[in-house]
Amino acid sequence: MLKILIPTMMLLPLISYSKKEWVWINSSIYSLLISSFSLLTLNQHMDLGLNFNMSFSADSLSSPLLILSCWLLPLMILASQFHLMKEPMAHKRTYLMLLVILQIALLMAFSAVELIMYYILFETTLIPTLIVIARWGNQTERLNAGLYFLFYTLLGSLPLLVALIFIQTQLGSLHILLLTLTPNPLQDNWSNDILWLACMLAFLVKMPLYGFHLWLPKAHVEAPIAGSMVLAAILLKLGGYGILRIIIILEPISKFMAYPFIIMATWGMIMTSSICLRQTDLKSMIAYSSVSHMGLVVAASLIQTPWGFMGATAMMIAHGLTSSMLFCLANTNYERIHSRTMLLVRGLQMVLPLMSSWWLLASLANLGLPPTINLIGELMVIITTFSWSNFTLILLGLNTVITAIYSFYMLITVQRGKLTSHSLSINPSFTREHMIMTLHLLPLILLTLNPKLILGLTYC
């Protein structure tokens, strides 16, 4: 782990001491080298001797998420250049250093082997994200969005802290490996039911489950591009990763405690997909589609079958890349037209023809068309939920149809139609933007050739 952590930490002095004309170039190239080097940790075998120490370890569940975190840092830096062009150099350095600190916290969170360490790092990610949203957001509502983000996350995670301290006093350890090997089935009584809720609530808020999702559209809409990318691609995955880690020690009461949450997740997918059909704000639509896709991950994780865990892991990686790409595309429009309203950015196919091809590919990936990894994740989740209850096939089928409708609605509204008068004199697309889209799309397609790399612990 130190082979990735120490170079990432050294980004901080690099950003501080680089000459002002070299800050963007140095940070982009260096972070791209770190992300390339992190690919060596991808093919994790069950023998973790080389990777294991008392504090941090990577296995086949955490290594895909670690690499996703490393992969997105250079893309966030590249995507933020135009946004910060007119800022003073001190503000640019602060912004980049916040992204690096967030990256370090995420790498340590995904590789932590103690649950209390995971909790501390889970909360640590809140601080740089909140500063990025509240300081560099576009509208005055960013402070309101930051408050929503802060209070939802804190109120959801306080019961988790109490539950972890209780488990520590009962079992004497919060080490992930020891907890999975300790035969301690929870008895069916009301106190253990409350313990289950306390453990799961923080992760369900972070995912977010429908009903706890109100902070997400606000935070996404008001965040700058790097904030939206890291929120959609990685921070939501902290919730899914936490569920997959902690649900093993909550047996056997998960079997009936999870029922209402699985139903809420599948129903929430339909509701949030339907909300997408009524959105006029482009970033808000992409944010609600994230809630819909995360509903699939929640349902698959709580059903607790090997296929469910594999489907949830694949969906998390696929959604991270797809939603980040969609936010980058929305940002390219915003940089030129200074509006997120879809009616005002219509007809861009005539002005930016190559960018419209990226829009088409991102929309197809969002609705899970082959050859993207989204398809493999969605198929596994659909099979899992169908084996749990036949009725869920109707809900998931309806969700797939609505997802296809709003994806094409978004594509047609933004790219087709009559060009508005203020869109006639916009800047052409840049090589930087095409590189960002390529680096998002390549993993989505190439992972289909060898999906076992991201299918997690239960792949055999």
UniProtKB/Swiss-Prot annotation:
Its EC number is 7.1.1.2. GO terms for molecular function: NADH dehydrogenase (ubiquinone) activity; ubiquinone binding. GO terms for cellular component: mitochondrial inner membrane; respiratory chain complex I. It catalyses: a ubiquinone + NADH + 5 H(+)(in) = a ubiquinol + NAD(+) + 4 H(+)(out). It is a multi-pass membrane protein. The keyword Transmembrane applies. Pfam families: Oxidored_q5_N, Proton_antipo_M. The chain crosses the membrane at residues 22-42, 65-85, 96-116, 117-137, 147-167, 194-214, 230-250, 256-276, 284-303, 308-330, 350-370, 373-393, 394-414, 435-455. Core subunit of the mitochondrial membrane respiratory chain NADH dehydrogenase (Complex I) which catalyzes electron transfer from NADH through the respiratory chain, using ubiquinone as an electron acceptor. Essential for the catalytic activity and assembly of complex I. This is NADH-ubiquinone oxidoreductase chain 4. It comes from Ornithorhynchus anatinus.
